[in-house]
């Protein structure tokens, strides 16, 4: 991108974002990232137990999808440099264990957490510094984690994901999954 920004009039922004979550996520235990898999584990839990791999200490920065879309809209409208790299995230790391506990609490389910210590615990903590996005574009994440979790749980329930046994609802037209780009649903 940087090379092409030097030889032509097109401007490029490389967005380095944290873990994105929200409605229309992939809620699949085998194929999704930590948020989607955790929601699926909690909502599909049997016997009143949710199992966490390792000790649950790994920590991730989670960013609600609408906040990322808002940044993309701002970058498209306000970018002045030919090329730039911008970090976009919540700026806060949450442990897998704390995420599991919050999803359980907000789901209203009565579940107990167990640990599978045969699985790895990788000492990892990531919190994205979004100060450049804030300074250059006036951007800050707007969605609190608990609010984003509630919106995601509602979408999951409304979409009937667990009952249908798939990651996302299919569009009624041509059997496609709805595409969402820059806040506009295209079906």
Residue ranges, per PLM feature:
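Sequence-level detector for tyrosine residue identity
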Residues: 3-4, 12, 21, 27, ...
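Active-site Tyr-X1-5-Lys
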Residues: 1-18, 34-47
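Flexible, glycine-rich beta-alpha linker
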Residues: 13-35, 58-59
């Amino acid at each position: 991108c940087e090379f092409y920004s030097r030889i032509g009039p097109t401007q490029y922004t490389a967005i380095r974002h944290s873990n994105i979550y929200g409605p229309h996520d992939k809620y699949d235990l085998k194929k999704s990232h930590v948020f989607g898999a955790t929601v699926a584990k909690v909502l599909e839990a049997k016997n009143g137990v949710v199992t966490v791999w390792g000790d649950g200490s790994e920590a991730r920065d989670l960013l609600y999808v609408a906040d990322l879309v808002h940044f993309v809209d701002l970058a498209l409208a306000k970018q002045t440099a030919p090329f730039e790299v911008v970090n976009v995230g919540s700026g806060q790391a949450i442990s897998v264990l704390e995420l599991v506990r919050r999803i359980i609490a907000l789901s209203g389910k009565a579940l107990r957490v167990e640990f599978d210590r045969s699985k790895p615990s990788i000492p990892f903590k990531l919190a994205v510094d979004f100060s450049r996005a804030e300074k250059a574009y006036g951007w800050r994440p707007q969605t609190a984690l608990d609010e984003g979790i509630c919106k995601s749980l509602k979408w999951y329930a409304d979409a009937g994901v667990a009952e249908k046994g798939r990651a996302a609802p299919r569009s009624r037209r041509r059997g496609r999954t709805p595409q969402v780009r820059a806040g506009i649903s295209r079906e």
